[in-house]
Amino acid sequence: MGGILKNVLILFGGNSFEHVISCKSVNFIINNIDTNKFNYKLVGIDYDNEWYEVTNIDIIDENWFTKDLNKIVNIIEYAKKFDIVFPMIHGNTLEDGKLQSMFELYNIKYVGCDSYSSIICYDKLLTKLFLEKYSIPQVPYVIYNKNTNINNIEYPVIVKPCKCGSSLGINVAKNKKELKKYIKKALKYDSNIIIEKFIKNNRELECAILQDNKKLIVSDIGEIINNGSWYDFDAKYVNQNNTIISNIDKNLKEEIKNYSKNIFNIMKCKGLSRIDYIYDLDDKKLYFNEINTMPGFTEISMFPKLINNTGIEFKDIITKLLNM
């Protein structure tokens, strides 16, 4: 006999640059959620931060928010009707801790990291400063502001907005002219920028963590085939052949898994995270790159692939997250 089904509110969209990725991720969730265990409703957030009830059919169209949909005036009262919220939102609104803060204030249960962890992890600079205290190895970097002297910078470098995901606003500069151009581009995404040494001869490696109650399931290592470039937006969400499960040196594999578990705990993450690394092939050194507290759940995203590779079916990944 089946028990009472848990009622789940799935949120997606948002007004961030990663809105489209969220729409792709939510399709993966609804295609894999176990409907023998969960009832669910969809609520989409448009680019103006308006909230709407949405159906599975509506979200097939990426312009779902242009339709005549039922607008939700009070999302708090609406969310209180559900047992748990699954906020499948990338970028600001969720990964910067805003939604979590609101849910915590009203005692609404949700999937994923809390507001404290999300705020720190979303800001690349805060993450770097935090993890430096724990001797986590990182690529040399400088914090850019209007007073930064860029005349002494050694090229190539990689320019990153501090608060933006999906590799948006990130570019590799090979000279001063390109650096100035890419700083301008990065400033469109965030007012704070970091400039890192770009390791040309590298491997981009990733590790996924899924929390199963108090147990942490740490994946094997994924690798991004970057062909000497870097893991940009298209590599993450368009070019399906750019991700593989990597066979790597046993010691390096264990080093990555141990760092990942430690970082997850240091940053007080909850539920899930994907942790990214750069491996310098010349110096044989591993560097932490970034942590993602709500990784993509598209058909080609690394997080579900890596966890699935541990033997956990896609639907069971979602079930574990919803049953925490």
Residue ranges of predicted features:
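ATP-binding N-terminal substructure of ATP-dependent carboxylate-amine bond-forming enzymes
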Residues: 2-116, 121-122, 126, 145-148
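Conserved metal-phosphate-binding beta-hairpin within the catalytic cores
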Residues: 209, 264-299, 307
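Hydrophobic beta-strand scaffold residues
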Residues: 40, 109-110, 138, 157, ...
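Peripheral (often C-terminal) accessory segments that flank ATP-dependent C-N-forming ligase machineries
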Residues: 247, 266, 281, 319-324
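Glycine-rich phosphate/pyrophosphate-binding beta-alpha loops
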Residues: 91, 167, 224-227, 292-306
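Phosphate-binding site of ATP-dependent enzymes
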Residues: 174-258, 281, 285-287
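Active-site nucleotide/adenylate-binding loops and adjacent lid/helix of ATP-dependent enzymes
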Residues: 2-12, 16, 24-27, 79-80, ...
